[in-house]
A protein has these predicted regions:
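Non-catalytic alpha/beta scaffold blocks inside enzyme catalytic domains
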Residues: 1-16, 23-29, 36-255
Length: 256
């Protein structure tokens, strides 16, 4: 796991994990091996969904074929999706759709705000930022990050507790804190590094006004007017999408 490998004795830790599994007879058998859960809760699952800037879920990339594949899975019209993306003029003078271009990674979002837009491969600077389960003190360039936060039009922090994201800047407006539930206040699957799934049940109800991530996401989609498209294949009970249907949908698209 990330806690073991990033330790000062990471190599020795990893060798010890493997030696322990060998001693217990858990190597070379079904369900065996040192297939751990990466880092904090469900890092592998998030990676498989590719909530990053360079790929669609399942590591399909951003090609037209990848978009058409996921359009079929979602039951969405590919041309409608394509029309939602702006385009830029490349160095060769040809128009390029942002749909097929890599976005700004989380480590460089600061530049998306502060950089001269003439130097960027997108029509405008980043004007809004959502920190969802992410504290910026895990990155460098905090002085520039503070300046970027203060330049944003809007900043949203979604976490069980207020993080550095909520207090780093000196801005007094345009910051919204949304309390998210912890892993014990919801249910669903988490994925190990060998892609095996572990299903977890809810232990307690969400505390106070906090909500699970998938409920917050549905509320956003409904507010922005595309919930009917986003949850076309997913049953929604009130404001809570059915996790089992979410699981069926991503399994349908990620056979690899």
């Amino acid at each position: 796991c990330m806690g073991g490998t990033q330790h000062t004795n990471g190599n020795n830790n990893t060798r010890a994990y493997c030696a322990l599994q060998l001693a217990l007879g858990n190597m070379g058998v079904a369900g065996g091996g040192a297939n751990i859960f990466r880092g904090h809760d469900n890092v592998q699952g998030a990676t498989d969904f590719c909530v990053l800037s360079h790929s669609l879920p399942g590591y399909y990339g951003l090609s037209a074929g990848a978009w058409k594949h996921w359009s079929r899975v979602w039951g969405e019209d590919y041309d409608w999706l394509k029309a939602r993306f702006d385009s830029i003029t490349g160095k060769d003078g040809k128009a390029k759709s942002l749909m097929n271009l890599k976005g700004i990674p989380v480590s460089r979002w600061i530049d998306g705000v502060l950089e001269d837009k003439d130097n960027m491969d997108q029509p405008d600077n980043v004007r809004g930022m959502v920190f969802w389960g992410h504290a910026p003190n895990s990155q460098t360039r905090l002085k520039e990050m503070k300046a970027a936060m203060e330049k944003l039009d809007i900043m949203v922090v979604i976490d069980p507790f207020p993080t550095v994201s909520a207090v780093l800047s000196d801005r007094t407006d345009g910051v919204y804190l949304l309390p998210a539930s912890t892993q014990y206040e919801t249910y669903g699957s988490v994925t190990a590094s060998n892609r095996s799934l572990q299903w977890r049940e809810k232990v307690i109800e969400p505390s106070f006004d906090s909500l699970p991530d998938h409920v917050i996401m549905h509320k956003f989609a409904k507010k922005f007017g595309f919930a009917d498209r986003m949850f076309r294949n997913i049953k929604v009970n009130g404001d809570e999408p059915l996790i089992e249907d979410v699981t069926r949908e991503f399994n349908k698209g990620m056979w690899t």
